[in-house]
Amino acid sequence: MGNLATNSRAFFVTGTDTEVGKTFFSVGFLRALNAKDLTTVAYKPVAAGCSQTSKGWQNDDALALQQACSINLAYDEINPIALAEPIAPHIAAKRATEAGLTIDMSIQRIEQGFSQLLQKQADVLVVEGAGGWRLPLGLDADGQQGFLSDFVANQNLAVILVVGMRLGCLNHAMLTADSIRQHGLKLAGWVANTLDPAMPCLHENIESLQGLLNAPLLGVLPQLASPNEVQDYIDLASLGL
């Protein structure tokens, strides 16, 4: 699996859009792994929408991941790039830079943090993206546009796609799956996350995606009260875990 330590497995969790349940699934996924006595660490390299704390800028999603890991990690290890404004990260970084802050949102910085987590020698490393699959990181030193998906491709990570079940999700899911494969990556599985139980033809849409995505359906998540319940609805065996 690319540059991974020999005793580690890493998965990149992406979504068909923002606010489709990536963090909810990722936290539940970590806790399901912990329940199987697997050691876990998590990485959310980029987070926008952070609050100022006594320990610096912190993001609620990254904090939830930190609490779900079986190995204790400092906040900065999980989320090295914490941006204040809840907007597209590359725009938030540009605005922060214009305000006099130093923001390094390069692929190299993201890969550095990833390498440090590999040194923890966890059984499984869960990386959660921000927004959707093709998240812009802004221009690099050579004026080239970088994307978070470039980091995933560089590390050859297996991808888990969280599909937010709502009108339009078929197109979003298929476009995302196509792009993942165009990067030469494996779509290890996908999760149907029920955003609206009253969605017309919910089950028919899930059945359609099963035929269209050509990847294992890891589980169908109803609306749940807690990520602790996720493990009751997902099949880890499909991931070889």
Tell me the role of every PLM-derived stretch.
Residues 132-134, 156-173:
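Conserved Switch II/interswitch segment of TRAFAC-class P-loop GTPases
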Residues 103-106, 110-144:
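Switch II (G3) loop of P-loop NTPases
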Residues 44, 160-163, 188-194:
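Short internal beta-strands
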Residues 12-26:
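Glycine-rich phosphate-binding P-loop
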